[in-house]
């Protein structure tokens, strides 16, 4: 009986293993196609078009906004991925409340980051850029959360496509702008930031539509005890992400 049980488990696991390997190969293939073209093609072309000063201006603001990025998630995405993969039925129960919790965290992140910008003496132009970059950070974090639901439901192919969708849209928008404004100094760095915003908004809308269809959300309600419970369960993941961030930055 023990041998039969082992054989049965092995037989049942094979399709899942095959599915995982196939989708892992798809993720790698898509990223190998898209990411190098983005980094070596579009991103490099934007740097050359706007010049070192403007790109450095953007990059400094981007790095500043990244300092408190942990506030946007607090380990929720990693916890949710594990939780939904083990309990698919919890998606419809938890999704709406987690979205509201993330909106609350996004508001805290935005306020703290903007206050930090004012404290260190950002001028109005820098604050405008910071607001756009903050929005992009919020959208990226939300996309990652939505993707954790897709992965938890084992929709690996959909997750793979979503993982490169924002880059594809950015490539299309930036390519058009770079062709139209190819003369040195004619391209503005804010267009690059807005192109990212547009790409993230479109990707968020598409992914949200897919996840809501799976979650069958009826209404969004504030559940403070639930918020506290989720944060308690997700904080170990937040600590891990924070430690990894320190490790990569130092």
Could you describe each region identified by the protein language model?
Residues 17-18, 46-54, 68-101, 151-157:
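Transmembrane-helix boundary and interhelical linker motifs in polytopic inner-membrane proteins
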Residues 9-21, 185-193, 205-249:
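Interhelical loop/hinge segments that connect adjacent transmembrane helices in multipass membrane
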Residues 19-77, 136, 171, 235-250:
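Signature of the first transmembrane helix
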Residues 83, 139-162:
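Membrane-interface junctions at transmembrane-helix termini in multi-pass inner-membrane proteins
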Residues 33, 37, 72, 96-123, ...:
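Alpha-helical transmembrane segments of multi-pass membrane transport and lipid-handling proteins
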């Amino acid at each position: 009986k023990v041998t039969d049980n082992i054989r049965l488990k092995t037989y049942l696991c094979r399709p899942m293993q095959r599915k995982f390997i196939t989708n892992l190969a798809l993720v790698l293939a898509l990223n190998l196609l898209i990411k190098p073209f983005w980094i070596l093609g579009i991103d490099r072309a934007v740097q050359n078009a706007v010049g070192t000063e403007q790109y450095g201006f953007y990059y400094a603001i981007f790095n500043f906004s990244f300092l408190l990025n942990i506030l946007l998630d607090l380990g929720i995405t990693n916890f949710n991925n594990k939780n939904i993969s083990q309990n698919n039925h919890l998606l419809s129960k938890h999704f709406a409340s987690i979205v509201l919790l993330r909106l609350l965290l996004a508001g805290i992140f935005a306020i703290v980051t903007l206050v930090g910008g004012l404290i260190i003496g950002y001028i109005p132009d820098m604050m405008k850029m910071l607001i756009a970059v903050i929005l992009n950070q919020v959208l990226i974090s939300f996309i990652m959360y939505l993707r954790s639901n897709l992965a938890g439901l084992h929709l690996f192919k959909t997750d793979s496509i979503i993982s490169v969708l924002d880059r594809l849209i950015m490539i299309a928008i930036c390519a058009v702008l770079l062709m139209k404004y190819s003369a040195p100094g004619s391209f503005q760095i804010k267009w690059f930031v807005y192109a990212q915003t547009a790409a993230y908004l479109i990707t968020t809308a598409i992914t949200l539509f897919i996840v809501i269809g799976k979650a069958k959300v009826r209404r969004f309600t504030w559940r403070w005890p639930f918020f506290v419970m989720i944060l308690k369960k997700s904080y170990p993941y937040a600590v891990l992400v924070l430690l990894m961030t320190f490790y990569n930055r130092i």
